[in-house]
């Protein structure tokens, strides 16, 4: 084998490796976004188990309403129960959260970090309210796929 042929072969191998790792990285980002969407899209009494299946154990949560933080193996379910109690006490109904285009999706090995704008629309005492917020999520890749390890919601 001559030097040119060897150099060409090495170049092709390197390019193939770079392209396949870039593709895998893009797939990881897509999977991370899908996991976050699967969690939020299933926050409802009829589909809650699907949302909870995206939560890792343990999970840490920070949110705007008391007690403001939840952690442990049942944190996602505990947060959902606290949210419903808070909403009932404060006459909040018809809540709907929508994510915008992610500002940041970073994947490093089996860990990921996701940040996106969120719009939360609801009625309080019958009046429409619209909140702009940031939604930040830390995820961990498991054998079952990407799972939420922590998340935080903050009004802007």
Predicted regions and their residues:
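Bacterial N-terminal signal peptides that target proteins for export
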Residues: 1-11
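A short gly/proline-enriched turn/hairpin at secondary-structure junctions
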Residues: 60-71, 88-91, 107
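Hydrophobic pocket/interface hotspot
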Residues: 39, 50-52, 59, 72, ...
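A mature extracytoplasmic/lumenal domain signature
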Residues: 55, 65-66, 116-120, 152
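Second-shell loop/turn segments in exported
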Residues: 26, 38-41, 62-69, 125
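Short beta-strand edge/turn micro-motifs at domain boundaries
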Residues: 130-156
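Surface-exposed, charged secondary-structure patches
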Residues: 77-125
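Short, low-complexity N-terminal intrinsically disordered segments enriched in polar/charged residues
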Residues: 11-13, 17-54
């Amino acid at each position: 084998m001559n030097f040119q042929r060897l150099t060409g072969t090495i170049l092709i191998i390197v390019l193939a490796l770079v392209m396949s790792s870039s593709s895998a990285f893009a797939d990881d980002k897509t999977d991370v976004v899908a996991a976050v969407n699967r969690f939020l899209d299933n926050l409802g009494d009829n589909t809650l188990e699907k949302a909870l299946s995206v939560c890792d154990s343990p999970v840490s949560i920070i949110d705007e309403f008391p007690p403001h933080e939840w952690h442990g193996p049942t944190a996602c379910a505990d947060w959902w129960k606290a949210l419903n109690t808070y909403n009932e006490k404060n006459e909040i109904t018809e809540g709907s959260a929508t994510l915008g285009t992610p500002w940041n999706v970073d994947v490093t090995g089996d860990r990921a970090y996701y940040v996106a704008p969120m719009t939360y629309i609801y009625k309080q005492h019958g009046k429409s309210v619209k909140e702009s917020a940031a939604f930040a999520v830390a995820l961990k890749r498991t054998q079952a796929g990407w799972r939420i390890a922590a998340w935080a919601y903050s009004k802007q």
